[in-house]
């Protein structure tokens, strides 16, 4: 299990931001056109005429997490409830792009924390997952960034994050192994230090919730 680094220059919360100037839509479209030529296609044929525009717009959306910040996302939705038992949001669907091949990986994220009196709006946990997923990623870093973010905004007694995902770079190319899943975890505070707390979390994410009537 992985413990993220939580302070100083090692912080991952705001890491991996593009430092180059914004590339224009036209430049992105030209790059897609070059890619089409590179794979032996004709960008002028009817079915591909709008492909450069569509691909550029799709990648802007799929990487829109670069333009978001944790402060703006949370927007003050932190409440002093005096609660000190585990809060778990499980089965958060996540889609991201592998930074090595820019192919999708997708799966579920489970996020838990034990408050230190303060709680955050539940939807914010899902939005944190979404923000970091919409960047070029590796699953290990994505898992750590989610844990770091919850730790940063709440300073809770502990944070636990588990992600289960399937990677298209292992399915569509390379070893070509459909059905393979990668599981990563980040445990902070009591989840790392106390075995019973960690086991409670792992038991809860394995348990199937009751069906919604």
UniProtKB/Swiss-Prot annotation:
Its EC number is 3.5.4.16. The keyword Hydrolase applies. One of its GO terms (biological process) is one-carbon metabolic process. InterPro entries: GTP-CH-I_C/QueF, GTP-CH-I_N, GTP_CycHdrlase_I, GTP_CycHdrlase_I_CS, GTP_CycHdrlase_I_dom. Keywords: GTP-binding, Hydrolase, Metal-binding, Nucleotide-binding, One-carbon metabolism, Zinc. SUPFAM superfamilies: Tetrahydrobiopterin biosynthesis enzymes-like. GO terms for cellular component: cytoplasm. GO terms for molecular function: GTP binding; GTP cyclohydrolase I activity; zinc ion binding. Zn(2+) binds at residues 98, 101, 169. Pathway: Cofactor biosynthesis; 7,8-dihydroneopterin triphosphate biosynthesis; 7,8-dihydroneopterin triphosphate from GTP: step 1/1. It catalyses: GTP + H2O = 7,8-dihydroneopterin 3'-triphosphate + formate + H(+). Belongs to the GTP cyclohydrolase I family. Toroid-shaped homodecamer, composed of two pentamers of five dimers. HAMAP family: FolE. NCBIfam families: folE, PRK09347.1-2, PRK09347.1-3. This is GTP cyclohydrolase 1. It comes from Synechococcus elongatus (strain ATCC 33912 / PCC 7942 / FACHB-805).
